[in-house]
Amino acid sequence: MGSFSIWHWLIVLLIVVLVFGTKKLKNIGSDLGGAVKGFKDGVRDGSTAPADPAQQVTANKSADANTVDVEAKQKS
């Protein structure tokens, strides 16, 4: 009772194809594959060691030449 035979799974597959159609199942499969690929790429990119944080800060400061550095003063 706990396991299903191959015939049960084939009948379920046939019903799913009849309900959703092959085109929609193809779209779902390609979307799922794209999501898995994106996840793997994200994990692979995240595993590389980041550069020195001090170098990142100086690179950001040089890129923001129009930014004005101000300091807020409290009223007495």
UniProtKB/Swiss-Prot annotation:
Primary localization: membrane
Keyword vocabulary terms for this entry: Cell inner membrane, Cell membrane, Membrane, Protein transport, Translocation, Transmembrane, Transmembrane helix, Transport
GO cellular component: TAT protein transport complex
An example molecular function term from Gene Ontology annotations: protein transmembrane transporter activity
Keyword Membrane: yes
A Pfam family annotated for this UniProt entry: TatA_B_E
Classification via InterPro entries: TatA/B/E, TatA/E
Transmembrane segment boundaries: 1-21
Biological processes per GO annotation: protein transport by the Tat complex
Membrane topology: Single-pass membrane protein
Composition bias type Polar residues, residue spans: 55-65
Subcellular localization(s) per the UniProt record: Cell inner membrane
Stretches the record annotates as Disordered: 44-76
Subunit-level organization: The Tat system comprises two distinct complexes: a TatABC complex, containing multiple copies of TatA, TatB and TatC subunits, and a separate TatA complex, containing only TatA subunits. Substrates initially bind to the TatABC complex, which probably triggers association of the separate TatA complex to form the active translocon.
Role noted for this protein: Part of the twin-arginine translocation (Tat) system that transports large folded proteins containing a characteristic twin-arginine motif in their signal peptide across membranes. TatA could form the protein-conducting channel of the Tat system.
HAMAP family from the UniProt entry: TatA_E
Similarity comment: Belongs to the TatA/E family.
Protein name per UniProt: Sec-independent protein translocase protein TatA
Organism: Methylibium petroleiphilum (strain ATCC BAA-1232 / LMG 22953 / PM1)
